[in-house]
């Protein structure tokens, strides 16, 4: 039995994916969330389509002034990519399910690889600014988690 709250989320995801799919010829292999440190990567892309978040059904809209709020469809290094200019934060009032909605839409479109950048602190004194990290776990004191409930 499917949990009663998951069906509307799946329908919204399918609607958003269908809308985005109308705007590209080749399914994207990668989703790039252009956060801190990756914003200029958009300048390296061959951009075919720019979709403002507020035009994509059910997509959250970033309230952070420095976030452009656009989904870019194109190529980078010859690979088909989707790139998000701006992401969503818990402190903006979004639920975890809303925050991860674009990632789930990307998966529905066939994306297999997600690249995210962010600014963070670290406890290990051997870490230096600009180090690349692979996150395989985290400490969450928020009391909410994007993996809670049906996935």
What are these regions (language model features)?
Residues 2-151:
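Metabolite-binding pocket within alpha/beta catalytic cores that recognizes anionic/polar moieties
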